[in-house]
Amino acid sequence: ETLVAKKSELSTQRAAAEKVLADLKANEAQYKQVLSEKEAAMESQQAEIVRLSRELAAQSGNTTATSGGYIWPCSSKYVTSPLGSRYTGIAGASTNHAGIDIGRVGYTTQAVAAKAGTVIISSYNKYRGNYVVVSHGSGNTTTYQHLSSRSVSVGDKVAQGQVVGITGTTGVSSGPHLHFEITENGKIVDPLKYLTNYIKGW
């Protein structure tokens, strides 16, 4: 192999490597933009949940939370992702997880109300998928996301343990699971503060 041919080969390899690097940087920038848009949308939706919960409390004259504790929102207790910052698989990027993910569920597993309350949202969006939000009074809510189907409508009063939907993988989801959130006085709290005997899967 001649020196000229070798230089030409190295030049081609360098150009290919530079293109790969440029593509990676472009993808990283695009990912950061998408992540920023998602976080902004989720914050807006969370504010709407708080508003609806407080509006319901004002209309009903009930400014105190329903009594009693929380039960598991599905039959599985296998938690695959806890509340808080988590790695997303892209270098340098993480996302703030506002609840817990419960795995080892399928497309027929029932999602049930962790506490009695009133349905304030039963809807779909591209991030949460099919989701249901139940108000328990005084700015306290529970949220059930990525459902394959929803079993309740806005305004429905649900008992603790009543089916609100069927688990699935709608919205931004890598597989069947139930994303579950609890808020108290409009603030996100760790569901594992109340849900005991969980199996750690992270």
Model regions and ranges:
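Alpha-helical oligomerization segments with coiled-coil/rod-like character
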Residues: E1-S67
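Catalytic cores of peptidoglycan-degrading enzymes
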Residues: G68-W202
